[in-house]
């Protein structure tokens, strides 16, 4: 039987820096690593199911649990069923990736979310909003599939006509759809107060994220203190508790209420497969320092779990590295 200490599901190039960092970290710990992608995923599934291959730890980046038959989801279950540890656990990820489920979980836990109408997949194409619902949704609201990801199937400036809602649902007739109030974040130091926050094994990594440009910026200690961003940590930690996911990202926005007070709102609830492909600064994308840190953290966690060492699952907030020439504090 072949055995691998660490495996990754990945459909992009293995030359991506995230994959190279994982390989480096595995090599440092003398761990064998398998990348399961388009060329070998089917044979890998068969080998695991038939006892010829054993995976001790799997980091999943590809499973589509909303698809009736998805080979990567099957691989996750095969690894779990043969005693391997899967991050994220396929049963938890399946539930958490459905926004029509997570929406109510967050509300019950006291987390603020946008005003939302959920259209179930069995409702007719003649579904229409009441005047009161249209009023609460406001002009130019969002329509998105409950199990969607990667901005797919989203309408960003909906008006609420019967034809428009029916057309949006054609993206996936078997899915529920969320009609969601559009959030307008406040501005803090010339930055849009919209955050993409990573949660990884108890650790919280907050980043600014511009929804218009896709630009990331790691939150600094000075910003974290000056703008009172500690609620980001509380909210994403509560989402982790609710969903039981160990690694994910969430989008949180700071908005102004009708009364003038500010509050943090969970906008895109859970992404159990965060964006991890580093891109040149001109293109924008996840930050190199953050992504490299995540790679190291994943392998270290796997090493400790499969070696029965203390897993270092602790609460901490990781902020941007200090520039000792131009202090950020």
Q: What do the predicted segments below correspond to?
A:
Residues 1-8:
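Extreme N-terminal starter segment of soluble prokaryotic enzymes
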Residues 10-124:
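Conserved N-proximal alpha/beta basic substrate-recognition cap immediately N-terminal to
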Residues 71-74, 190-194, 247-248:
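Short, surface-exposed coil-to-beta transition loops
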Residues 106-107, 131-153, 174-188:
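ATP-grasp fold ATP-binding core
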Residues 254-329:
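C-terminal active-site "lid" helix and adjoining low-complexity regulatory extension at the edge
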């Amino acid at each position: 039987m072949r055995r691998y200490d660490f495996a990754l599901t990945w459909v992009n190039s293995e030359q991506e820096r995230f994959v190279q960092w994982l390989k480096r970290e595995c090599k440092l710990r003398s761990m064998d690593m398998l990348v399961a992608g388009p060329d070998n995923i089917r044979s890998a599934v068969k080998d695991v199911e038939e006892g010829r291959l054993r995976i001790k730890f799997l980091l999943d980046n590809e499973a589509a649990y909303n698809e009736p038959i998805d080979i990567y989801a099957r691989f996750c279950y095969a690894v779990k069923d043969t005693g391997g540890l899967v991050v994220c656990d396929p049963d938890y990820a399946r539930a958490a990736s459905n926004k029509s489920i997570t929406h109510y979980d967050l509300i019950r836990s006291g987390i603020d979310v946008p005003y939302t109408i959920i259209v179930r997949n069995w409702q007719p194409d003649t579904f229409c909003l009441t005047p009161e619902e249209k009023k609460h949704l406001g002009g130019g609201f969002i329509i998105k599939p409950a199990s969607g990801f990667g901005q797919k199937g989203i309408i960003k400036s909906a008006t609420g006509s019967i034809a428009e809602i029916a057309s949006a649902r054609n993206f996936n007739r078997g899915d529920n759809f969320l009609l969601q109030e559009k959030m307008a974040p406040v501005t803090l130091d010339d930055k849009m107060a919209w955050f993409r926050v990573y949660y990884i094994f108890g650790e919280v990594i907050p980043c600014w994220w511009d929804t218009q440009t896709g630009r990331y910026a790691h939150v600094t200690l000075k910003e974290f203190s000056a703008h009172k961003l500690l609620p980001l940590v509380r909210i994403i930690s509560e989402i982790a508790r609710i969903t039981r996911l160990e690694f994910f990202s969430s989008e949180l926005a700071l908005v102004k209420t009708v009364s003038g007070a500010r509050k943090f709102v969970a906008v895109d609830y859970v992404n159990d497969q965060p964006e991890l492909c580093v891109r040149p600064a001109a293109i924008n994308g996840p930050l190199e320092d953050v992504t490299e840190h995540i790679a190291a953290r994943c392998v270290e966690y796997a090493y400790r779990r499969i070696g029965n060492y203390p897993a270092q699952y602790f609460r901490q907030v990781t902020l941007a590295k200090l520039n000792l020439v131009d202090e950020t504090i």
